[in-house]
């Protein structure tokens, strides 16, 4: 065996901490970014937040091209030094059209959030505490509430509840009596044993003079399976009800809630703050960043000026390190916002027909289309469109919403899956309720409009819209 030395030249991309920070900030949602910046403000004394209600002195800044995130991901290093007076204003105005302040309609932007985090069990137990139960009945009520699932149904037999209490002096009749009291709690119908029981409990709360009440009770008690199958012909025959009477009774039943527990929201609150604002001005669609969604940062000049006057090397190093971290963070935010604005403008430009006329006019578009237009990598587009939201006159949409697959048309063109879903929804909305359109018929109608799509694809689109099949949509006219 012969030993020797060999020289080999190769190139390798090094992921510096600064590049990692730029990538991480790019994929954060607005809420996550706010939390990240708040942590930075608390840990880095060289960073400070600009009070948007105070006048900010204009500072001279060095002229330089904005570094977009795509370049940042491809370069091995970012510049070693940044201007000492780098502030949020010098960064943010580059991405906001002149003459606009980032304010929206009435200076207010909607913040969408979920409902209360209170669980159904919490809500029921609150009512138990307010109800004049004896100690024994309260123990029974607690066991019953524990056996209720999130949809509001009882999940175990009463015999099991009785056994779990472990009191030989309590009998099944007493458990049944407490159950009936709980079933009158809000939401009405909770703790029902099955669907039939749930609906009948809700009907029992109606005034006895309510029209069609007895007919509705008859259908639920004896013919719920026929109603579930929309077999109205057989239902009219076995109940001997005329069509108009049956229709009214069915309408009353449909006003009931088959899952009463779900009216109590149990999920964590979800907030959506728009990152991008889109509006039409003088006949043109304008795109700007939401300047109110992210804290505005700048270098703390007082602490920065102490860098060269520190008492010892340790203090000097601490200030220099935090100063550089602050500069990198501001630069990374500049990169993030520039990328977000460029991509958003490109999306709006490509999908102008959607903003003008709605979902039916959505163009097929994939990540590669935008990546090519803005000269960035697809992975960058994916990061910047995930959990980023756009506010427009048509509503709030995640940027990823505007990307969809294509379907060939008869004329050799393409239609987006989003547009086809909108057409399916429109066709179903206009159908005869007594003779709803089957998936095959929908496929045929789309074909007449030049859109060639398989029946199973239509079924998939219909299901994605939470629209039941035709046999379940059938109604009495």
Swiss-Prot record:
Pfam family of the protein (one): Sigma54_CBD
InterPro entries: RNA_pol_sigma_54, RNA_pol_sigma_54_core-bd, RNA_pol_sigma_54_DNA-bd, RpoN_core-bd_sf
MF term (GO), any: DNA-binding transcription activator activity
Motif (RPON box): 454-462
Highest taxon above the source species: Bacteria
Disulfide bonds: none
Comp. bias regions, Basic and acidic residues: 50-62
Region of interest: Disordered: 45-67
Gene Ontology biological-process annotations: arginine metabolic process; cell motility; DNA-templated transcription initiation; nitrate assimilation; positive regulation of DNA-templated transcription; regulation of DNA-templated transcription; regulation of DNA-templated transcription initiation; submerged biofilm formation
Keywords: Arginine metabolism, DNA-binding, DNA-directed RNA polymerase, Nucleotidyltransferase, Sigma factor, Transcription, Transcription regulation, Transferase
Signal peptide: none
Residue spans binding DNA: 366-385
One annotated Gene Ontology cellular component of this protein: cytosolic DNA-directed RNA polymerase complex
Protein purpose: Sigma factors are initiation factors that promote the attachment of RNA polymerase to specific initiation sites and are then released. This sigma factor is responsible for the expression of enzymes involved in arginine catabolism. The open complex (sigma-54 and core RNA polymerase) serves as the receptor for the receipt of the melting signal from the remotely bound activator protein GlnG(NtrC).
Family, as annotated: Belongs to the sigma-54 factor family.
NCBIfam families assigned: PRK05932.1-2 (NF004595), PRK05932.1-4 (NF004597), PRK12469.1 (NF009118), rpoN_sigma (TIGR02395)
Protein name (record): RNA polymerase sigma-54 factor
Organism whose genome encodes this protein: Escherichia coli (strain K12)
Gene: rpoN
């Amino acid at each position: 065996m012969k030993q020797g030395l060999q020289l080999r030249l190769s190139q390798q991309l090094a992921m510096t901490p600064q590049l990692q920070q730029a990538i991480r900030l790019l994929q954060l949602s607005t809420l996550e970014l706010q939390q990240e910046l708040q942590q930075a403000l608390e840990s880095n004394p060289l960073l400070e937040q600009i009070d948007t209600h105070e006048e900010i002195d204009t500072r001279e800044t060095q002229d330089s091209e904005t570094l977009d995130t795509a370049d940042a991901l491809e370069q091995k290093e970012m510049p070693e030094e940044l201007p000492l007076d780098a502030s949020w204003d010098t960064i943010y105005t580059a991405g906001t059209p002149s003459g606009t302040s980032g304010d929206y309609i009435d200076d207010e932007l909607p913040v969408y959030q979920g409902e209360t985090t209170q669980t159904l069990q919490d809500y029921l137990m609150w009512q138990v505490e307010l109800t004049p139960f004896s100690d024994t009945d309260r123990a029974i009520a607690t066991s019953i509430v524990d056996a209720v699932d999130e949809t509001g149904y009882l999940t175990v037999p009463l015999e099991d509840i009785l056994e779990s209490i472990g009191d030989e002096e309590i009998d099944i009749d007493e458990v049944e009596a407490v159950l009936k009291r709980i079933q009158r709690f809000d939401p009405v119908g909770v703790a029902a044993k099955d669907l039939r029981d749930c609906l009948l409990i809700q009907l029992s709360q109606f005034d006895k003079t309510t029209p069609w009440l007895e007919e509705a009770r008859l259908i639920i008690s004896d013919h719920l399976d026929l109603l579930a199958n929309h077999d109205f012909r057989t239902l009219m025959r076995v109940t001997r009800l005329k069509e108009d009477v049956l229709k009214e009774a069915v309408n009353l039943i449909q006003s009931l809630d088959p899952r009463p527990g779900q009216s109590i929201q149990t999920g964590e609150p979800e907030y959506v703050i728009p990152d991008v604002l889109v509006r039409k001005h003088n006949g043109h669609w304008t795109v700007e960043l939401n300047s109110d969604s992210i804290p505005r940062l700048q270098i703390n000049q007082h602490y920065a000026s102490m860098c060269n006057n520190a008492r010892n090397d340790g203090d000097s190093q601490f200030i220099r390190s935090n100063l550089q971290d602050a500069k990198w963070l501001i630069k990374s935010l500049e990169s993030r916002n520039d990328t977000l604005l460029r991509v958003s403008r490109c999306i709006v430009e490509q999908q102008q027909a959607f903003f003008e006329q709605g979902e039916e006019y959505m163009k097929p578009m994939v990540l590669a289309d935008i990546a090519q237009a803005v000269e960035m990598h697809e992975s960058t587009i994916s990061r910047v469109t995930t959990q980023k939201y756009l506010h427009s006159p048509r509503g709030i949409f995640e940027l990823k919403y505007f990307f969809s697959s294509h379907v060939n048309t008869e004329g050799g063109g393409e239609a987006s899956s989003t547009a086809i879903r909108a057409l399916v929804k429109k066709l179903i909305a206009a159908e005869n309720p007594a003779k709803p359109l089957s998936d095959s018929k929908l496929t045929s109608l789309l074909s007449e409009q030049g859109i060639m799509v398989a029946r199973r694809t239509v079924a998939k689109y219909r299901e994605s819209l939470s629209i039941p099949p035709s046999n379940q949509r059938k109604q009495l006219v």
